[in-house]
């Protein structure tokens, strides 16, 4: 990416950050909602069966992965709103690099996702959760989580461009939910019916959650999933990033 494109992308990122200052409620909701889910699942379903060690130690890494899959509606709504209101057309009339709007939006979303991880890890620590791996493994786990988020983000951007209207986002967002709940984020596949366990084991998010548990040093965590946790998001990016860019290019003509 050229310096010209980077400058335009940073301008679009600052535009999104300024929106946070004007409308902080959405940012707060996106940071608080994962904490509410953690407390709900941790205390209401805290005795999950089939999990080695304490359920809290199993749950929190899974919730970190789940958080990276959810919360895409903010980005999807922002993209569709700009399309619906003709903002994209106004930007197109300016000497601006192609795709800078999407890159700026994705950069702001990644910053918000990093903040959500910090909040959730802090709450987990307050609840007694501890990381048993070293600092390098910890950073590796955070990197895998953000990589998974980045892949999910571009899936969301593509779906938003296909939807085209803000009112369609909620319907499209429902398509993302199975990725989160049909995973091992909350329970072991061994405790599920055979066919469902197979689906869960093939879910890309399950590989991320399992790899993160391993890197965090969770007692009883399964090893050998770091490679899959890298390959799956990269494969999704290889598919949906060009699809989103191509779709955006067609809409901008």
From Swiss-Prot:
GO terms for molecular function: ABC-type transporter activity. It is found in: Cell membrane. Its main location: membrane. Induction: Exhibits high expression level. Disruption phenotype: Deletion of the drrA3-drrB3 operon decreases by 79% the daunorubicin (DNR) titer in cell culture. The drrA2-drrB2 mutant is more sensitive to DNR. Deletion of the drrA1-drrB1, drrA2-drrB2 and drrA3-drrB3 operons almost blocks DNR production in cell culture, suggesting that disruption of these operons impairs the efflux of DNR, resulting in intracellular accumulation. The gene is drrB3. It is a multi-pass membrane protein. Residues 25-251 form the ABC transmembrane type-2 domain. GO terms for biological process: response to antibiotic. Keywords: Antibiotic resistance, Cell membrane, Membrane, Transmembrane, Transmembrane helix. It comes from Streptomyces coeruleorubidus. Belongs to the ABC-2 integral membrane protein family. GO terms for cellular component: ATP-binding cassette (ABC) transporter complex. The chain crosses the membrane at residues 27-47, 59-79, 109-129, 142-162, 168-188, 225-245. The complex is probably composed of two ATP-binding proteins (DrrA3) and two transmembrane proteins (DrrB3). This is Daunorubicin resistance ABC transporter permease protein DrrB3. Part of the ABC transporter complex DrrA3B3 involved in daunorubicin efflux. Responsible for the translocation of the substrate across the membrane. Confers self-resistance to daunorubicin, an antibiotic produced by S.coeruleorubidus. The efficiency of DrrA3B3 to export daunorubicin is probably lower than that of DrrA1B1 or DrrA2B2.
